[in-house]
Amino acid sequence: AMSTPQLLDTRKTVTRQIIESAGIPLLFIEKESGQNGTLSLYPGSNTVETWLSADGATISLSNGELVATRGLGDDLMGSIVPRVKTLKQRLGNPYTKTMRFLTADDQNDDLILECTVRQFHKSEEIVIFEKSHEVLKYFETCKTENYALENLFWQNSEGLTIMSKQFHSPSVGQLLIMRLK
């Protein structure tokens, strides 16, 4: 019988020294199950960045906001999100987000969400793999008639998302996403 490969815990193997010596942008993601890994930026990404893991899974982010995944299970096929770069520009105005999933028989299943975002006014310091970042925290609440979800984003003074906790799908739950470099 095949033995199940032991899941590597990136938190135990990756150090700041490894991150810096890699010399490339790196992303860390972790599922609610504890499964985690690092991804590198796919060349040629523009406003939507696509990050690729060693085993071929991808995650696409628009300034840190989850827009699509492949290979994570119950994948997010695509999303329509507001076209503003920073969350700050969304404050005070409700907006719509559409998350597209596939049903078992390959039909599109769109989750249409009404969302609002608010900002915690005090900046805070977060540490990601031994590196500290001064950030502002944003709290996004989205709902449909029978579903509610919450996303958290930590952005630096340039509006770059350094860390987030975002809803991925009903089966995967939330993803923790951290920008390592």
Pin down the residues of each PLM region.
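Acidic, serine/threonine-rich low-complexity disordered tracts
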Residues: A1-S60, E65-G73, G92-K181
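Surface-exposed beta-loop interaction hotspot
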Residues: S79-V81, T86-Q89
